């Protein structure tokens, strides 16, 4: 009898001890990053709203989320409603996006709006008469009207339904081309093609579609009296040629319109650096210390233009399980760069959003996540448990 009681007592004490360990106070990552001037966030898909473990991580350690696809135009635009609209302007279905923003609001997280204008994967019918891809393209005038209406409706919807939750928008995404994707005479390098496919925004509106998008976004934010920051977002932003073209573009955006007194209106507040760091689908180029200097220089260069900077889609790539310690060391050094650039009074870096949050050790080389994020690149393992790299970053931030 005594032995049975002893066993029962042990069984009762084991879970209690486990709970005690789990309940030990943890410093949220975002509290540590905010002490250095920048938010800490992660990506969230609609399906992850049912992943309780990941949601708990976001609630505990993040103060920002970005919807991976659900706030993009191709997810929001509703063809049947657009065709039936009385004013000929586009209409949207916000149901999935609303659930995600509502979750953020309920749990005290801000949302990066991503993204208003992006040529990739865009619904073709948006550019055609009667919203029918089988009919001719609309005129520049009509396309500008549709663009203004779309941007105005989307920003207004989220601000009025969830006041203050969407704290910034990527207004335009990846408009700066590379290689032969732009007119060499254009210092902004506005892309005319992507992977051999024409940029329909460029073809229907012209190369100034970016400036108009920012004008419409700024006018909407001003009319709402909202505190929403407006970003231009792109990849390869820390390489010199792309960086210089982005600077030329932001200068063009911020000199495009004037206020009532004739002074230039600042339409663009900052640059989103996507932050896919390392080889695309290959270990070659991963954890290259030279990238740390490039990132630091890029942040400072954009800041010198009066722009704030956010790392918006960060994945520190690693494809080799044997190099997880090297990966952790590189990640810590990267966060040291973030802290260092913010040591002055201006603190130009205002946010870091990690998209390569999880390990995918069984990913195949042909998959999208393999190429974009790598297999052993996460702050969390494949089960969503924080890895040593996560705690090493926390320890460094506490120093």
Please give the residue ranges for each predicted region.
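Sec-dependent N-terminal signal peptides of Gram-positive bacterial secreted proteins and lipoproteins
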Residues: 3-20
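Short loop/turn motifs at secondary-structure junctions
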Residues: 4, 61, 162-165, 267, ...
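Boundary/entry segment of secreted carbohydrate-active catalytic domains
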Residues: 22-64, 68-70
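Aromatic-rich peripheral "rim/lid" segments of glycoside hydrolase catalytic domains that contact
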Residues: 28, 77, 157-160, 164, ...
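Substrate-binding cleft and catalytic face of glycoside hydrolase catalytic domains
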Residues: 30, 60-81, 87-237, 307, ...
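Acidic-and-aromatic substrate-binding clefts and catalytic sites of carbohydrate-active enzymes
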Residues: 43-55, 74-77, 82, 88-95, ...
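Short, acidic/polar
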Residues: 46-61, 147-157, 242-258, 295, ...
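Glycoside hydrolase catalytic-domain groove-lining segments
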Residues: 94-95, 102-106, 203-233, 238-322, ...
């Amino acid at each position: 009898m005594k032995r049975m009681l002893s066993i029962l007592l042990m069984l009762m004490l084991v879970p209690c001890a486990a709970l005690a360990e789990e309940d030990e106070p943890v410093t949220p990552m975002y509290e540590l990053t905010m002490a250095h001037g920048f938010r800490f966030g992660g990506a969230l898909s609609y399906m992850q709203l049912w992943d309780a473990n990941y949601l708990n991580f976001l609630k505990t350690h993040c103060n920002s989320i970005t919807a991976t696809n659900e706030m993009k135009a191709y997810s929001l635009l509703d063809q049947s409603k657009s065709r039936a609209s009385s004013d000929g302007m586009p209409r949207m279905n916000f149901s999935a996006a609303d659930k995600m923003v509502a979750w953020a609001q309920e749990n005290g997280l801000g949302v990066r709006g991503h993204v208003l204008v992006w040529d990739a994967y865009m619904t073709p019918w948006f550019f055609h008469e009667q919203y029918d891809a089988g009919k001719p393209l609309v005129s520049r005038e009509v396309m500008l009207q549709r663009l203004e209406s779309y941007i105005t409706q989307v920003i207004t919807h989220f601000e009025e339904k969830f006041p203050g939750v969407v704290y910034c928008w990527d207004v335009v995404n990846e408009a700066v081309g590379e290689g032969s994707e732009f007119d060499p005479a254009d210092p902004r390098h506005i892309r005319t093609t992507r992977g051999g496919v024409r940029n329909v925004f460029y073809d229907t509106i012209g190369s100034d579609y970016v400036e108009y998008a920012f004008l419409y976004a700024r006018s909407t934010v001003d009319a709402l009296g909202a505190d929403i920051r407006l970003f231009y977002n792109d990849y390869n932003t820390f390489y010199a040629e792309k960086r210089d073209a982005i600077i030329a573009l932001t200068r063009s955006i911020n000199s495009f319109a004037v206020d009532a007194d004739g002074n230039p209106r600042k339409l663009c507040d900052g640059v989103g650096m996507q932050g896919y760091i390392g080889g695309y689908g290959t270990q070659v180029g991963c954890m290259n210390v030279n990238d740390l200097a490039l990132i630091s220089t890029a942040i400072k260069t954009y800041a010198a233009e009066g722009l704030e900077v956010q790392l918006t889609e960060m994945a520190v790539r690693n494809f080799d399980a044997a190099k997880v310690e090297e990966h952790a060391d590189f990640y810590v050094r990267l966060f040291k760069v973030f802290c260092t650039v913010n040591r002055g009074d201006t603190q130009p870096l205002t946010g870091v959003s990690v998209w390569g949050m999880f390990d995918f050790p069984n990913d195949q080389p042909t998959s999208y996540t393999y190429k974009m994020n790598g297999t052993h690149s996460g702050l969390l393992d494949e089960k969503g448990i924080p890895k040593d790299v996560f705690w090493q970053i926390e320890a460094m931030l506490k120093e």
